Amino acid sequence: MIGGEFNTPADWIRSGNIMPIIDDFTAAHGGKAPILVFVDSGGSFNNDTECVNGPRGNAADHLTKDVRPYVISQFGASSAPADWGVEGWSMGGTCAIDLTVMHPDLFSTFVDIAGDHGPTAGTKDQTIERLYGGDAAQWAAYDPATVMRAHGPYGGVSGWFEDTAEPVGAKANSAQHGARPQSASPLGFGGHDDWR
């Protein structure tokens, strides 16, 4: 579970109020619950890494090469991608889809709560400079839409986008695929950043 910029892993517990949800799930499943990991993707309160490798840190490598193997070795977690998901809020939501589409060999499920359409730190040019040290090829390597087009159809991968704002272009994009954007939020659409 990955928070946004200006968040800490503890925010899932404090402001996210996740403990009653975990307790209810555990009670409903005979005392069994998933291993939940509240990760720090930035190393500090205001380091907006967007979970990429770049001048702000090697966050992608930290999450895929340090955190995941550690959880497997220290907690006996399964290494099967079908048993791994990434959930995130804001920047963490962007991280969730990015990590999953880039590493379907590691993660099979994501929940993107109010994430951006891709790693973002200003305009596209500003993002390339700030997150990738000016390397435009790295921007493309971490852009979810570019990654998905290059990968082709995914098998065994699923995701959930939760936002109170209808994603820009969602109606046109989903219409050509026979679907329409929906919100599971009791508030409907209207809120934070949008995935498109």
Per-segment meaning from a language model:
Residues M1-R196:
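Non-catalytic cap/lid and distal C-terminal segments of serine-dependent acyl enzymes
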